[in-house]
């Protein structure tokens, strides 16, 4: 059961995040409306998510397939889009395609093939982002920058996939200067990708920035920031959605 104190905390947190987002956008000479707030709701209950859906949150991001299934089935997002932002295994693609408005974490041609097949079966075109391992960390998913353009070309060749942009998570141990540099690299990669005019592509999404660095991401061109802890508080991994 979500308490009144939790509700107040969430409402105040989202209001503060919105203020910070608007200030960061204006400082960068951008329209605040260009940037959407994605609530990263991994481990959050259906009740928590349903309440937060009434706040000025634009969309929701799920890291786990089962949580996406449970929350979409329960209409926890209250009509707002749900995105898949975690590592997607090929054997779970069928549960995500058609449920997620956007799959943000595509990083292989094998995954592209599975998504394309599943989307064709449903008679739809699935929007995706390509995830870049911008810090070239062995422990993280995503393609390196050198492999990006061949993967974009492969995505553009799939009839039931539409490229929408790029996603990244900088290294957690990067300092503020390094993080800004990674975000700037992402902005430059998106511009280069957009200039190639891939078939069916609409390269207008740059998903980067989380609770601790979303203002810096906005300064460098993010159009989606993924914020979890700053909205819901510290995660309790013993809870199930």
Short names for language-model regions:
Residues 1-212, 220, 232:
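Conserved alpha/beta-domain cores
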Residues 222-240:
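Gly/Pro- and small hydrophobic-enriched strand-loop and loop-to-helix capping segments
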């Amino acid at each position: 059961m979500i308490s009144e104190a939790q509700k107040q905390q969430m409402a105040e947190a989202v209001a503060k995040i919105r203020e910070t987002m608007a200030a960061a956008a204006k400082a960068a000479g951008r329209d605040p409306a260009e940037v959407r707030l994605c609530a990263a709701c991994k481990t959050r209950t259906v009740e928590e998510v349903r309440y937060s859906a009434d706040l000025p949150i634009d969309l929701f991001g799920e890291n786990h397939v089962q949580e996406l299934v449970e929350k979409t089935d329960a209409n926890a997002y209250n009509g707002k889009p749900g995105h898949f932002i975690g590592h997607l295994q090929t054997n779970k693609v069928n549960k995500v395609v058609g449920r997620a408005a956007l799959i943000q974490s595509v990083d292989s041609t094998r995954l592209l093939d599975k998504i394309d097949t599943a989307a064709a079966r449903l008679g739809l075109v699935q929007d995706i982002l390509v995830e870049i391992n911008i810090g070239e960390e062995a422990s993280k998913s995503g393609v390196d920058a050198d492999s990006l353009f061949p993967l974009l070309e492969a995505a553009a060749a799939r009839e039931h996939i539409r490229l929408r942009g790029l996603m990244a998570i900088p290294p957690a141990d990067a300092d503020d200067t390094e993080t800004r540099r990674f975000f700037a690299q992402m902005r430059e990669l998106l511009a280069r990708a957009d200039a190639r005019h891939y078939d069916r592509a609409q390269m207008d999404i740059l998903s980067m920035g989380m609770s601790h660095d979303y203002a810096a991401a906005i300064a460098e061109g993010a159009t989606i920031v993924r914020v979890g802890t700053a909205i819901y508080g510290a995660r309790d991994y013993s809870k199930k959605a």
